[in-house]
Each structure stands twice: as C-alpha cells, then as structure tokens.
From Swiss-Prot:
Required for the assembly and/or stability of the 40S ribosomal subunit. Required for the processing of the 20S rRNA-precursor to mature 18S rRNA in a late step of the maturation of 40S ribosomal subunits. Involved in cold-warm shock-induced translocation of the RNA exosome components from the nucleolus to nucleoplasm. Its main location: cytoplasm. The gene is rps-0. It is found in: Cytoplasm. This is Small ribosomal subunit protein uS2. Pfam families: Ribosomal_S2.
Amino acid sequence: MSGGAAHSALTEEDVMKLLATQAHLGSTNLNFQMQQYVYKRRFDGPNIINVKKTWEKLLLAARAIAAVENPADVVVVSARPYAQRALLKFAAHTGATAIFGRFSPGCLTNQIQKTFKEPRLLVISDPRIDHQAVTEASYVGVPVISFVNTESPLKLIDIGVPCNNKGERSIGLMWWMLAREILILRGKISRQTGFVLEGKEIMPDLYFYRDPTETEKEETGAHADVAEAQEYQQPTDIDFTTQGGKVDDWAAETATWTAETKTTEEWANAPTQSNW
C-alpha cells in the first residue's frame, strides 16, 4: 500500500498520538470481515487494531476525498455526540458539508425535502449509528467512507478505516488526521510545516469532544479569577473636623416639653349676649 512510501510513511509521532488516544483499542466483539485488521486479542478481552493498516486505510480515504473536485460535494455525517465537534471542524477546514445530529430520512433520496442533498461522497463515523445514511447512499450510488470498529459491519461500506470510533479522543484524532492528509494532498499544507492554517497550528485537541458541564465550570472559574484580580477601591475618608465654619448644635434647636404654652380661655367665663 501507499503507507510504505517514504513521503507518507507512518511517523513515530503519529503512532504516539494513536496510542495516547487509544485509537488502537477495539471492542470485545469481532466481525469476521474485520479480522484482517486485528493484530491480536488482549488478555482482558479487547481486540488490538493494527495501526499500520489503520494508517494505510486513512491515506486511501484521504485520496478518495481529495479527488472530489468540489469539496462541498463531500457530505460528512455523524449522529454520535462525541464526533459532532470534530465533524464541524473537519467541514470548516476542508470545505465539506456537515450533517450532524439526527439524519433526516430521505435526505439523499427525497427530492422535495428542503434538506435534500446530492453528494458525490459520504463520510460517516459509525456504520451502526449512521445506518440510515448508509442505506440511502446505496440507493443513489454514492460511495461511503466510514470509521469502523472491530464489531462494525462492512456491508455497503466502500472504504473502512479501522479504529476506535467510540472513544471521545480517538474519534476526534481520526477526523483530525483525515483532514490533515486531505489538505496535504490538495497542497494547502505540507508535511514539513505540519497542520498550520492562516499562521495558526491546528492541534488535535481542537477536534476533541468537550463536555458542556466542564466548559461551564471553566467559564465560571475564569469569571471568578477576573473578579478577584480587580482591585477594590475603598472610599476616601473625609475629616469633617478640618472643615471651616461653625458646626451648629442640632440638640439646642429642639423644643423642650417644659416650654410655656399659651393658656386657653374658659368658655363659661365668656359674657352672654342678652340682645338677640
């Protein structure tokens, strides 16, 4: 395969990334069609995927995607929550059309739908979860590229990239590596400079899934740090004794209860009027 070429050989750095994100760990079940990609079975059950064959299939998938003249004709689909962030980043960097979340039935076959699309290539994260998209692609003759685990069925899948497609970090790394290889084949980046776009290095963790609760905690902590960093300005003390002028004694102005009051006249002593 092309993975043996010197310019596209699997580097030690990429191997370390695959091992760090556990992209080589498959499930405990094994499909007979995936047996050719399994290196060995671990003592506690999981199947170990051969990372060399993963790399070869990844390069084949990247060449198929890069061969599409219009990048928007490549539709990427994933209903798995862990892959949706990676899906959006992949579409933004490669120009593909992203469909994340629930795949509407008839999106590829029903022409009267508003979401109807006519792709030339379909890329998915899991053939089990995205089975509706795979079925409709087979009806209209659209090739399908998928990340597959050791238990995934390869029926209706044209190119399967063996990897751990259920891990939060592993699926993000696979989308990142696929986007990098596509951009290298298109000539937008080089293998020597790395994954650098517009002067910014695109790291693999940009494609990783982020828990909304953890993001909220980080934002809350950042606001608390900003509030503590702001200095509290205490009000200036004013010394009233230094001001000029005489200070009146308010107590002297209050009326006392012992003050003399005007006596009222008694009505009985008033003279009576005899002449009506």
